[in-house]
Amino acid sequence: MNIANIKLPEEWQLDLYKKEKISKLKSDRDNKEVEPIKYNGFLYDYDSKARERINAAIIALDDMGAGSRINWTTYNNYDVLVTANDLRKIIANVAIRSNKLHTVYRLAKEKVEQATTKEEVDKITLEL
């Protein structure tokens, strides 16, 4: 018997479809978490390398003393002066965005789990 010719019961097909959708929603959420973040009118990178640089810069700026600034290249290649507090606020903005994304993901996941048709599943997105 060729396994490719086996037809799963409709309920199983829907369950698999839901699992795929939830996996895609999670991937979308994770990708949005590392998108550039807006602060003071500029976009800042927030991938793993950028996070390391931001954290190192905060330490350096704190060590340099109150009011210290460094030149920072934004996502769009603008050079701006930032303080340790600016960099902390960027991290805070990311935390707020991350919380929203996780909340929206959980709600979308619940909707997928409650859906009774593939069409219902297809309509579900991460809406911020």
Task: Tell me what each language-model feature is.
Residues M1-L128:
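A preference for well-ordered globular domain cores
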